[in-house]
Amino acid sequence: MVKILEKIFGTKNERELKRYFTIVEDINRLESQISSLSDEKLKQKTDEFRERLAKGESLDDILKEAFAVVREVAKRTLGMRHFDVQLVGGLVLHEGKIAEMKTGEGKTLVATLAAYLNALEGKGVHIVTVNDYLARRDVQWMGAIYNFLGLSVGVIQPDASFLYDPNYRLPDRRFDRLRPCSKKEAYLADITYGTNNEFGFDYLRDNMRYSIDELCQRELNYAIVDEVDSILIDEARTPLIISGPSEESTDIYYAVNRIIKYLKPENDFKLDEKLKTVVLTEQGSQKAEKLLGIDNLYNPSNIQVVHHINQAIRAHYFFKKEVDYVVKDGKIVIVDEFTGRLLEGRRWSDGLHQAIEAKEGLKIEAENQTLATITFQNYFRMYKKLAGMTGTADTEASEFAEIYNLEVVVIPTHKPMIREDYPDAVYKTEKAKYEAVVKEIEECYKVGRPVLVGTTSIEKSELISKMLKKKGVPHNVLNAKYHDKEAEIVAQAGRIGAVTIATNMAGRGTDILLGGNPEFLAREMLAGKDYTEEEYKKALEKAKEICKEEHDKVVSLGGLHIIGTERHESRRIDNQLRGRAGRQGDPGSSRFYLSLEDELLRLFGGERLQSLMHFLKIEDDTPIENKMVSKAIENAQKRVEAHNFDIRKHLLKYDDVMNSQRNEIYSFRKEVLESDSLKDKVFELLEIEIDEMVDFYLAQESEGVEKLKEQLSARFDIEVDLSNKSKDEIKEYLLEKLREAYEKKEQKIGQELMRDVEKMIFLHVIDTKWKDHLLGIDHIKEGIGLRGYAQRDPLVEYKKEAFELFEEMSRNIISDILTRLFKIQIKEESQVKVARAQKIQRSDGDGARRPVEKPKKIGRNDPCPCGSGKKYKKCCGKNS
């Protein structure tokens, strides 16, 4: 029935495209009118649009003209005109949807349309890229359009921030036209480019600031996420964590690592390769107890040891060197499983990183305690409007809709796609597969046809590299180890005779032009020389001629050939690799070479194929090439995708609990930060605290009143008479006494200083308690899986316990803030003068210096001078 209706009315995607192309026709009709405007008149359009918005028009009212203006400015500044399909892409982005546009269709240029239109509101637009190089490159490239139209453009990087300035010229092309600025300035720009990591971390950092002037980000208004599938799906489960060192010893990691070689799979522990989980058997537990000299591994005091053993087994059996991580300068550096890039500075959490350090015999860095954390899923769901672009999103359309409420619109290519995708070639062994891959590379190289080979790990790319060296085939290896030259290698991967081996999707974001990229070639020709703008232009002209000649030759050879050496768990990643060929109507082809020893086939249905090959007596070096086989593999991928989606959906339910708590704490913290006076808030908290204290102590039959008086004296320094008063009268009386005491303290300290002290104590207590809460949540997560064995729903139990923990934290925050405020002691003026005088070094008439008395050093076990009643090391001395 659905199919019949689709035939009559078209699919939803087709109906949407029809609507968009109608709007595009209206934009095209404005082209001649807009192109007749002078530069000056064109520049004035931005102010005109802003005035119209101020008078009550909406963005949709000015959309057609704004898009026509951006198209004209792109022609004048970059010599590039937006195609109709690119205008459709801009419309999709403006409506807060995902535009699926194939590789080479100009997504970078598409973003300028929606970014310009939405920036006119003055609330900020964030354009999110997958790496820092692309963020910088896109600002340098597209900055000319925004600058012409009077918009400011910023770019945030981990160690610096910049504003686009066409007059700021540098010989170093990486930073040319990028004027250094503060991070806050970059965020105040109309449009800000940066990576998902940087935007997310800045959000967390802002929620740890102690002054409103230090905040960088504005309200999260509108984001355009480039390579949206990579960021919102592949990295969705990755939490961004800001952490500080914990006080635990690292010896346990070495001790546990030493016993792993004595524990055997199956007998001592069970491995689940699909879920990457470990379970100790009864025999394994007893063996571990004996080896570690522990009586009972499951005694509550040893529960962390069980966790460390599990992580050590995972480190040895699931995490492979040169695949999941590399050892660099004595440190473990994670390899991104999706892009093959090195993730410098990133660490696995939960003790896994330390377990791998122990496995490799490296110095173990102490496990960090989480200070602030958020997942990409929850960060990006905070934007008022979210949109995205990618070459491959349709396979995950249901996930985008369900989790982010984002619709995917598949946009047709500007020119028909003529790439030929051959069926998979499946071999019995990995050895036979790689020999076939190298043979095919050799054949392409002999005729000069460029080849791009996609591998799933550094190890595999280096294996192919070794085999090619033996055959004398020159090639470039592009993996996590050499990502500095990534863009240059990818840009020239379409030249005659180029052989490029790329780990996974490294180099994403840079187009492979058949015949090569003239800009990169021109820079290569001038490498190591000081050159003028004129010399660069000449080199560029020469490079264009060379590339044009090579382009025609490569086209006649059939274009770029893609070889995949293994299927990824996700069809989308495979499609991304294929999508590197056949851009903008160019010819091209692709083929995947697989073996029954590949991980995907081994875990999902390789046995059936193996028995089929055995039954048909197929030789090791003879491949099966059959559409049915490719279909079976695709079905295996669909199963894995569905499985991974379920995991992400399930984890999101857990994370939503944390998310609502985070929002609660951060909005309270923001209220504190933005407040000029917290005095009313202090009195509000006093009412809550006195209510609870009186109810609690008066419920105790004997000595309740005396205990209440003791508490009031210890915490608030007040003596009270509670005789002959009802419960409500006691509450009213105590509030009156405490307000008086607070007013006196304020008079003594001074109004202005008291406001500063309030803010400092509020923020310090909130941060300390939130940090402790995050640790508590981690402990709940560790044990929650065991609830399933007691026939309880772990999610329900987690929600209940997390809520109780949050309630407890909220009570502790109120209690701690009030105790500290009432205990605070400020030195009197005379004491301050004496203290200052002691610090000044006076000299005698003969020039000899008098000894300066050192103030008494506070010992770590001394009472904290802030008056909290805690030891100095557990309070203000914690971070000393």
Swiss-Prot record:
Protein name (database record): Protein translocase subunit SecA
SUPFAM superfamilies reported for this sequence: Helical scaffold and wing domains of SecA, P-loop containing nucleoside triphosphate hydrolases, Pre-protein crosslinking domain of SecA
Catalytically driven reaction(s): ATP + H2O + cellular proteinSide 1 = ADP + phosphate + cellular proteinSide 2
UniProt gene name: secA
Function: Part of the Sec protein translocase complex. Interacts with the SecYEG preprotein conducting channel. Has a central role in coupling the hydrolysis of ATP to the transfer of proteins into and across the cell membrane, serving as an ATP-driven molecular motor driving the stepwise translocation of polypeptide chains across the membrane.
Recorded coiled-coil stretches: none
Keywords: ATP-binding, Cell inner membrane, Cell membrane, Cytoplasm, Membrane, Metal-binding, Nucleotide-binding, Protein transport, Translocase, Translocation, Transport, Zinc
GO biological process: intracellular protein transmembrane transport; protein import; protein targeting; protein transport by the Sec complex
Residues noted as binding Zn(2+) in the record, renumbered to the chain: C864, C866, C875, C876
Superkingdom assignment: Bacteria
Natural source organism: Thermodesulfovibrio yellowstonii (strain ATCC 51303 / DSM 11347 / YP87)
EC nos: 7.4.2.8
Pfam families cross-referenced by the UniProt entry: P-loop_SecA (PF21090), SEC-C (PF02810), SecA_DEAD (PF07517), SecA_PP_bind (PF01043), SecA_SW (PF07516)
Quaternary structure annotation from Swiss-Prot or TrEMBL: Monomer and homodimer. Part of the essential Sec protein translocation apparatus which comprises SecA, SecYEG and auxiliary proteins SecDF. Other proteins may also be involved.
Gene3D superfamilies: Helical scaffold and wing domains of SecA, P-loop containing nucleotide triphosphate hydrolases, SecA, preprotein cross-linking domain
Membrane topology recorded in Swiss-Prot or TrEMBL: Peripheral membrane protein
Listed Basic and acidic residues bias regions: 841-860
Group of enzyme by EC: translocase
Subcellular compartments: Cell inner membrane; Cytoplasm
